[in-house]
């Protein structure tokens, strides 16, 4: 791991999300569109955060450079993609969104965050789930997930898009 990289794990039931972090998450999310869905405003960031079980944050020199929103099966999140996993698995961790700053993409930051999350899955003996756009095709994300040994379980329509449902056990 990069010595200058620090990873912080927030638990929404315990940790408040500061205005500064909401702003940083919002900006990082918006910079990663269309790979990520847009968030409307800071309140939308807060709503997504409140659905999370964990929020993984990566900092370099105290600047947020990546985040991952993670939910378990008890979340009240209504996303159809999340609900797909909720209907098919008793217990799991679900990655709703991951964003890495342009300057730090393809430098192992995403993999480092995923490894931290997957360790929780190993401890609990549960799968790690997510989806990736296949229409339009997000080749970078698909390759990233397949390299980390995620398996595509099916492809599903999602509005005008299509997504591949992925799982790592």
Please provide the spans of the model-predicted regions.
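Conserved acetyl-CoA-binding loop-helix of GNAT-fold acetyltransferases
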Residues: 100, 106-119, 147
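Conserved beta-hairpin
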Residues: 54-72
